[in-house]
Amino acid sequence: MMSVSLAWPAPAKLNLFLHINGRLPNGYHELQTLFQFIDYGDWLDFKITATPELKLHSNLSQVVPDSDNLILKAAKSLQSVTGCIQGAEIWLDKRLPMGGGLGGGSSDAATTLVALNALWQLGLDKKALMDIGLTLGADVPVFINGIAAFAEGVGEKLQPVDVAEPWYLVLIPDAHVSTADVFQHPDLPRNTPKLDMSSLSPERWSNDCQALVSAKYPQVANALSWLVEYAPSRMTGTGACVFGEFGSQQAALEALAKKPAEMQGFVAKGLNRSPLELRLAQL
């Protein structure tokens, strides 16, 4: 019987700020952001097989085609780089919204790389996994690294940070925001002055995509206008999700209980060390 390994977390991230500093000659945007994890996300289970086939099961009603699925792409990339002839059957319990700015797809890919590297006993170090992850998406290395980070460049230059770990109320507006559309929009601010590590004070944190997305998606604007009545609030990534910062779990839960019925949301704890790091330490 092949080995089964259960309950690998693929946590969400929040961009505590997102500043766009300019546009590079290759068309990519130069940015600065601060990534922090939260104790809420997707879950993956793995059954290791002796043959190289890969199968993915999911609780989603709409399954992403295999050719576009980041979980399968991650597993295949790992096989390709290492020559591994083992395979896996993978179960995804999807809890994070797609197009929400919480990094769900990138986190799923990162957890797949980290878990299969361990379960296939490949022995790649974190840097090698991050290099593979970067070929799958700009945010994947953040989740592999597993530590809250100040990111620069196109998001690939990471410096560990130790910031407060508050409770968050995250709202999920009924909107799917295209990251590509946001970054291509002519009205997106692209000239925010750069911060350095010594000036990462929260009063300077903002999201340069927020005004544009709020104008285009009234669901996002409505969520922000409601949430800001209870706590300092802003959008994560290019949206659509927004978050408010609370001093206690109780305060966040009390606000959640008052949210309008048409809004979805959850309460989660900010974490400077990813739950994936903690899961790996249990092996």
UniProtKB/Swiss-Prot annotation:
- This protein's record includes keyword Lyase: no
Positions binding ATP in this chain are: 97-107
What Gene3D superfamilies does UniProt report for this protein, alphabetically? 3.30.230.10, GHMP kinase, C-terminal domain
What does the record give as the reaction this protein catalyses?
Answer: 4-CDP-2-C-methyl-D-erythritol + ATP = 4-CDP-2-C-methyl-D-erythritol 2-phosphate + ADP + H(+)
Q: Which GO terms describe its biological process?
A: isopentenyl diphosphate biosynthetic process, methylerythritol 4-phosphate pathway; terpenoid biosynthetic process
Q: So where's the catalytic machinery, residue-wise?
A: 13, 139
**Keyword set includes Calcium:** no
Which is an annotated GO molecular function term of this record? 4-(cytidine 5'-diphospho)-2-C-methyl-D-erythritol kinase activity
User: Which is a Pfam family this sequence falls into?
Assistant: GHMP_kinases_N
Q: EC no.?
A: 2.7.1.148
Query: What does the record give as its pathway?
Result: Isoprenoid biosynthesis; isopentenyl diphosphate biosynthesis via DXP pathway; isopentenyl diphosphate from 1-deoxy-D-xylulose 5-phosphate: step 3/6
Q: Which UniProt keywords apply?
A: ATP-binding, Isoprene biosynthesis, Kinase, Nucleotide-binding, Transferase
What is the main EC category here? transferase
Q: Which cysteines are joined by disulfide bonds?
A: none
Functionally, this protein is described as follows:
Catalyzes the phosphorylation of the position 2 hydroxy group of 4-diphosphocytidyl-2C-methyl-D-erythritol.
What protein family is recorded?
A: Belongs to the GHMP kinase family. IspE subfamily.
* Annotated NCBIfam families: ispE
This protein is called what? 4-diphosphocytidyl-2-C-methyl-D-erythritol kinase
Species the sequence originates in: Shewanella amazonensis (strain ATCC BAA-1098 / SB2B)
